[in-house]
């Protein structure tokens, strides 16, 4: 099984920790956050990883070499010349995901109790183009799913902005969840990234929302999903407690 880890971020929320190191190597409970994600993927049965790099990318390369790639096959998708955001990063790494086998994508700054093998297998059983692990929304930004857990749109509850263009939000008609930073993608999606809008830098969520009416993009909704965004200083201490439990 294959997976991709987003490790190219600038880590601006973690300054000054990221003034001299990449966000992916900021320690959490004595280990770099990248190591936590790699080991979680390895435990779930993933054997081949792609890791994108940008900010202090050479430190990530050295870290992986020093740890013998944790016994896995690891490829580097090098974005040191230009940061491509999540969608552009996935598209740049497309050459590592040939064939029809889906791959899991995981943010480096996320800790969770998600069973990654379960999320991956759930996607394969559904035979959909893409799948995201969702959790009850705690922010004003909500992904909107129908009763079959198919992605229909997005709304910002404070501003009432909606996506995609032309989407009309009807209260009470949707299951509303937050994006977890964990998703599974079928390589067939790369065929839909050929347009001008999907060149260079772009967020993957913009792509999902633009194509959700023509593709089958589903949600693996976990009401008991516990997730911590460790990309912020105030959550690092909570993350250490989370890992102890």
Q: What would you call each of these model-derived segments?
A:
Residues 126-136:
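A short, conserved acidic/glycine-rich loop-to-beta-strand motif
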Residues 1-29, 42-44, 221:
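Glycine-rich N-terminal loop/short-helix segment of MobA-like nucleotidyltransferase
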Residues 25, 76-77, 130, 154, ...:
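Generic preference for hydrophobic
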Residues 54, 77-79, 133, 220-223:
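Conserved beta-strand termini and adjacent loop/short-helix elements that scaffold enzyme active sites
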Residues 10, 108-110:
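Active-site metal-binding loops of divalent metal-dependent hydrolases
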Residues 13, 59-62, 86, 92, ...:
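Phosphate- and divalent-cation-binding pockets in alpha/beta enzyme and binding domains
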Residues 2-5, 31-107, 118, 198-199:
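Conserved N-terminal catalytic core of the sugar/cofactor nucleotidyltransferase
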Residues 101-104, 111, 117-124, 137-138, ...:
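Catalytic-core segments of class I nucleotidyltransferases/pyrophosphorylases
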